Design a protein with these regions (language model features):
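Active-site recognition of the HExxH zinc-binding catalytic motif
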Residues: 54-66
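Metalloprotease/metallohydrolase-associated module, dominated by Zn2+-dependent proteases
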Residues: 1-51, 67-107
Length: 107
């Protein structure tokens, strides 16, 4: 499946656990990886439920940072990706709710 961020087409590939695409640069294993060069997000196909959604959101956050040329240290990038993956839905849901109330004149 594919999606577009800032005009760049990305794809998501579900791969077997332990797949070489799930290796970090330091050689350690992961359950998700965002490859800017290939414009591909690789996710361990054994994931499911809320954890799968959080890993997907985390990796899409990396894709957005690459697509918008947002440069951070590794630690900063991971912090932002983790925050959005864990709490982004709640933040956007609240913002949407407040925005709708303001538009209707309830403020």
């Amino acid at each position: 499946m594919t999606f577009v961020i800032n005009g760049e087409v990305w794809q998501v590939r579900l791969v077997p656990a332990g797949h070489h695409s799930l290796r970090r640069p330091n050689g350690s294993a992961s359950v998700g990886c965002c490859d800017d060069r290939l414009k591909t997000i690789f996710i361990d196909r054994t994931l499911h439920g809320r954890f799968f959604l959080e890993v997907l959101a985390h990796e899409i956050t990396h894709a957005a940072m690459f697509s918008y040329n947002i440069e951070m240290t590794y630690e900063q990038e991971e912090l932002v990706a983790n925050m959005i993956a864990k709490y982004g839905h709640e933040v956007l849901s609240i913002a949407d709710s407040v925005f709708k109330k303001i538009k209707r004149g309830y403020y």
